[in-house]
Design a protein with these regions (language model features):
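Alpha/beta-hydrolase active-site loop
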Residues: 41-62
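Catalytic histidine neighborhood in serine/cysteine hydrolases
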Residues: 228-248
């Protein structure tokens, strides 16, 4: 069995702290070590506020320079980090790592395979029916975490997730992906909330990085293109594609040091001066 690794947020926070940055790591509201009920719900509004609340907290610490604050968002919270960057002018530099566009994947399905009004309507019907069931039961049905055992015909990206969340690399007893998953209706609100709508108005520095072989790489490529389109502040934006890396390699390095921490140190040092 693999040696147990730090969780995703701590891997980034600890390494950046070792490189001289003051860091704070947090789980999104309603998940993991964070409080709030109902559990296992996502919210474009509240999860954006999570980042802003962290900035609030850092800004009143005596050892923090309020003109030198940056954020890192990973996976679904990579896309949310870009949303925060478009909203919070206190943030001077943003990194979105192995990002998902949560609005897009919830509305259109993986690889835009459900991108039609009829497909979206069918999903809405199903989830609204589930809302009523949940209300009557007084509890939320879970959607299920990463499948285990892994079927032989599982898609590549499911196998990638299994290799992280169901092994010592990333398993945690309070990780929703390692266990019961999000609530069935947990991400429903993203369908109607385009979190990257104003990404091309981001003035501060932004680095989007993704694994070349990640199933999700299209989110980063398209998010970068949208962010720099007609943006007069495009010069401080960058897309970095990591050769041979898959999605979860940027969670913990994938055993091959896939996370470019030298680049992150350089990016934040140059853009938070």
């Amino acid at each position: 069995r693999r040696q147990r690794q730090m969780c995703i947020r701590d891997r980034y926070a600890q390494t950046m702290a070792e490189r001289g940055f003051l860091t704070i790591a947090f789980d999104p509201s309603f998940t993991g070590e964070s409080g709030g009920t109902p559990r296992y719900m996502a919210s474009p509004d509240i999860n954006t506020e999570d980042f802003q609340a962290a900035v609030d907290f850092l800004s009143v610490q005596e050892n923090v320079d309020t003109e030198r604050i940056g954020i890192i968002g990973i996976c679904g919270w990579g896309g949310l980090a870009l949303n925060v960057a478009a909203l919070d002018t206190r943030i001077k530099a943003t990194v979105a790592s192995t990002m998902y566009d949560m609005s897009r994947v919830n509305a259109n399905g993986y690889f835009d395979g459900e991108d039609s009004a009829d497909a979206r309507y069918a999903k809405k019907e199903s989830m609204n029916a589930q809302r009523l069931v949940d209300y009557k039961n007084g509890s939320y049905a879970l959607g299920g975490g990463v499948v285990d055992p892994l079927p032989e015909d599982a898609p590549f990206f499911v196998a990638d997730y299994h290799d992280y969340y169901k092994t010592d690399r990333g398993y945690h007893k309070r990780s929703l992906n390692s266990n019961g998953g999000w609530n069935v209706i947990g991400c429903m609100s993203f369908m109607n909330q385009p979190i990257l709508q104003y990404s091309n108005e981001i003035r501060s520095a932004a680095l989007i990085m993704h694994g070349e072989k990640a199933h999700s790489c299209y989110f980063s490529r398209d998010a970068y293109a949208a962010m720099v389109k007609d943006n007069p502040y495009a010069d401080n934006k960058e897309l970095l594609i990591i050769p041979d890396a898959v999605h979860t390699d940027l969670y913990d390095g994938g055993g091959k040091d896939a996370i470019p921490f030298d680049k992150l140190e350089q990016f934040f040092s140059e853009n938070m001066r």
